[in-house]
C-alpha cells in the first residue's frame, strides 16, 4: 500500500543556496519538532564551496 497523502507532521522540503538561488538538496522535516526554517551549511556544486542553504518549498 502507498503512503497517505495529507497534512502529516513530516513534510518534504528543498534546500536553496543563498548565493546562487539553486535548489541543490531535498530533505524531510518534522513540523512538530522544528517550527523555524532550516538553515544549513552545505556544498554548492556550482560555486564549488560550502554556502548557506535555507529551507524552501518544493514546487
Swiss-Prot record:
Gene3D superfamilies for the chain: Ribosomal protein L33 (2.20.28.120)
Top-level division of the source organism's lineage: Bacteria
InterPro entries: Ribosomal_bL33, Ribosomal_bL33_CS, Ribosomal_bL33_sf, Ribosomal_zn-bd
A GO term, aspect molecular function: structural constituent of ribosome
Entry GO terms, CC: cytoplasm; ribonucleoprotein complex; ribosome
The keyword Glycosyltransferase belongs to this UniProt entry's keyword annotation: no
One Pfam family linked to the record: Ribosomal_L33
Keyword set, alphabetical order: Ribonucleoprotein, Ribosomal protein
GO biological process: one example: translation
PANTHER family assigned to the protein according to its UniProt record, in alphabetical order: 50S RIBOSOMAL PROTEIN L33, CHLOROPLASTIC, LARGE RIBOSOMAL SUBUNIT PROTEIN BL33C
Protein family per UniProt: Belongs to the bacterial ribosomal protein bL33 family.
Protein known as: Large ribosomal subunit protein bL33
Origin species: Borreliella burgdorferi (strain ATCC 35210 / DSM 4680 / CIP 102532 / B31)
Gene: rpmG
Amino acid at each position: 500500500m502507498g503512503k497517505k497523502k495529507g497534512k502529516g507532521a513530516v513534510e518534504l522540503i528543498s534546500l536553496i543556496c543563498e548565493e546562487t538561488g539553486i535548489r541543490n538538496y531535498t530533505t524531510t522535516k518534522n513540523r512538530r519538532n522544528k517550527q523555524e526554517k532550516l538553515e544549513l551549511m552545505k556544498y554548492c556544486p556550482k560555486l564549488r564551496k560550502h554556502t548557506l542553504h535555507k529551507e524552501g518549498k518544493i514546487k
